[in-house]
């Protein structure tokens, strides 16, 4: 796969898959998961610092996330950052640690979250289709400019289509796994 058009298409499709994994990792499934607070930044000594750099994040129980700051003076800053991060869970500060108790999901809420997962998967598929379209357009331009032969173009188009099919299957699998996790939660 030495063709730069093909490599660019593959890279864009892999980015769509990685982005979907990150996004779905932040969707709560009724269980504690450290990824819920991955993107929380805390103002610590005047600088925005990722939460995981100033506190230990553990999961002592299935639905409890425990945040233990390395510096007890940062406790209130962490609590404030969790409130402003809008993660949908109110932090409980007991003076030395912060607990995030994930509420039990109702059947209706599970369905809503499963729909959200489906929407995110569809957005990832759109990115994959756009990468495919761009690659096909670039192949046609290269063929018109006599950079590649017609036979090479058809071979490369087939490879782009195979990459697209593979990326779509991966996205479907990721989506199905997350939906299963949510509905069985």
Curated annotation (Swiss-Prot):
Residues that span the membrane, as ranges: none
Region (Disordered): 163-185
Gene Ontology terms, MF aspect: ribosomal large subunit binding
Main location per the UniProt record: cytoplasm
GO terms of biological process kind: translational termination
Gene3D superfamilies from the UniProt entry: 3.30.1360.40, Ribosome-recycling factor
Keywords on record: Cytoplasm, Protein biosynthesis
Entries under Pfam families matching the protein: RRF (PF01765)
SUPFAM superfamilies: Ribosome recycling factor, RRF (SSF55194)
Cellular component GO terms held in the UniProt record: cytoplasm
Cellular localisation: Cytoplasm
Compositional bias (Basic and acidic residues): 167-185
Keyword Protein biosynthesis carried by entry: yes
Function (record text): Responsible for the release of ribosomes from messenger RNA at the termination of protein biosynthesis. May increase the efficiency of translation by recycling ribosomes from one round of translation to another.
Similarity annotation: Belongs to the RRF family.
Protein name according to UniProt: Ribosome-recycling factor
Protein source organism: Latilactobacillus sakei subsp. sakei (strain 23K)
Higher taxonomy: Bacteria, Bacillati, Bacillota, Bacilli, Lactobacillales
Originating gene: frr
